[in-house]
Amino acid sequence: MATTEHPPPSRLRAWMLEGLSDMGKGHAPKGAQAEKEPVDEGQPWYRVMCLTGVDYFSTLGYQPGIAALAAGLLSPIATIVLVIVTLAGALPVYRRVAEESPHGQGSIAMLERLLTFWKGKLFVLTLLGFAATDFLITITLSAADASTHLVENPHLNSALHDKQMVITLTLVALLGAVFLKGFLEAIGVAFALVGVYLALNAVVVVSGLYHVVTEGHVVTDWTTALTAEHGNIFVMIGVALIVFPKLALGLSGFETGVAVMPHVKGDPGETEEKPKGRIRDTKKLLTTAAVIMSCFLITTSFITTLLIPEKEFEPGGEANGRALAFLAHEYLGNAFGTVYDVSTIAILWFAGASAMAGLLNLMPRYLPRYGMAPHWARAVRPMVIVFTLVAFLVTWIFDADVDAQGGAYATGVLVLISSAAIAVTIAARKAGQRNWFIGFAVISVVFLYTTVVNVIERPDGVKIGACFIAGIILISLLSRLLRAFELRVTSVTLDDMAERFVRDIASRKIRFIANEPDSRDKAEYRDKIEQIRQDNDLPEQEDFVFVEVTVTDPSEFEAGLTVRGQVMHNRYRVLTLESSSIPNALAALLLNVRDTTGCIPHIYFEWTEGTPFANFLRFFLFGQGEVAPVTREVLREAEPDRDHRPRVHTG
């Protein structure tokens, strides 16, 4: 490629762009530079579990209250349905996702392989829109909920009652600061928060179960009220199946669980292509998190339903949004209750950490590769700043209101889980695994039902998700438009025959003819040479090599280029290339030939028929169009020095 001198980067720029070369490419950089850069070897799976666990486990702060409001006395039964869906549905789905897509791209990567060209890109952008909805709302909703707990604390209410927006924005900014410091620090903080929070919840659960046992009448009162309200067990189960989608926030941790996979430490010596240790340990991570959460969901739903009066769950009630905190204060005293409050506020604030980690693993692996984000979007720290600013905007739009964001959050979670279920169903069918295919198909139907019910009840979630999708698609297409003339070939490799052709003509003036392959018969090449000679008034003795580019997938942006040489009809030398864009491939070849030979190559075109605008659209969408001027523009951007720029001739 073009070798242009650049001043050494500033310390701030170097710090901001640290890790740029290997983000989103799935492998470490090669060469001397790679040796200087520290390699993130990952963390043990149980520590990474805490990074996704701050999102997953923190829902205990509000899940029992949501279940009680949604299902009333049926809350424990509806929660059991949710746990069955978790362990028999979401868990096997995401264990398979971890196996099929072990680089943090989740089910989106699996579905991407099924669709090609622009329809595949638009489909991925739509799923990324829902992922952004899920992850960003996780950040803003959790921070807002933490600030709500803080503001509603009896000791702080008078001082903070009108400061919720400021507190929420401060918590989001602090979260961004942790990630600017680095992933290891985020995992360390998450490990401490989750450990303390689960221990405190275990104490509350044991205390609650003790009071259920010692106050035997509460069980009798509950079963009597259930029978009076619903009649028999079959009606209860039927109603529980109808209301359980309202409890879907309890499924929030799975997508982030596979999104943070790259941070799981693998076995010594394993490769990125076959990370068996990472896959095995991520399955442990998912299973352990699901089992822990299931135990807490059932026990907390049971004790809160039996021990807390129903009116306290209503808006304005003492247990509204803080059911377990209510029990902590009620049965373990205000000192323990205050410690529990602090732990809950801390984990709710940091719940956005797993979402931020998911965004940082997901977005840089797609958008820059599609040419739909700047090159620096592959680096971690600039993206942290971008996501933090977007979280500020979302918080401001929703006025830091937890309830207003709930619909969007649940919709994002359920759409991603449904897409994952469909992806593994297709994978099982392709692998010829009939039993798994049937099982995953049933799971897909369950999650699609849950999603539809949720959308009907909370249509605002789809509207907000649609805004994210529209925003991502619009920004992505604008970015692709602005980067249209970039040299987007990452490497050029010539086979032996191609290298021989280049060496041969380097002793004379290097002249290439850009040829659109048609029948590739002898007459095609003979007529093309004659036309180029006449158009450019070149003498008979001038030597030429043909260059032919076949467009593969024009929706792709960056890729390596392989150049193959062949002799056609025992006379005409032809270099053949495959690329997403003809002008980019030709420009990359010319710059490579210049750099390897030290000579300025010339390339000859004929004008393309059609209007400039129509030809630009053909180039933008299909990689073709008016090749000559676009090739020249790509060369101009890649090599500012006219004296060193390959020459483009058109006739």
List the model feature ranges, each with a label.
Residues 64-113, 119-125, 140-172, 196, ...:
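Extracellular loop-to-transmembrane helix junctions
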Residues 223-224, 374-383, 417-462, 484-504:
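C-terminal membrane-solvent junction of multi-pass transporters and transport-like membrane proteins
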Residues 117-121, 161-170, 265-296, 364-399, ...:
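Loop-to-transmembrane helix boundary motifs in multi-pass membrane proteins
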Residues 206-219, 269-275, 287-323:
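Extracellular/periplasmic helix-exit of transmembrane alpha-helices
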Residues 195, 199-252:
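Helix-loop-helix junctions that connect adjacent transmembrane segments
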Residues 1-62, 111-113, 117-125:
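Membrane-interface "cap" regions at the ends of multi-pass membrane proteins
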Residues 37, 48, 97, 101-134, ...:
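Transmembrane-helix boundary/entry motifs in multi-pass membrane transporters
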Residues 1-38, 487-651:
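Cytosolic C-terminal regulatory domains/tails of membrane transporters and channels
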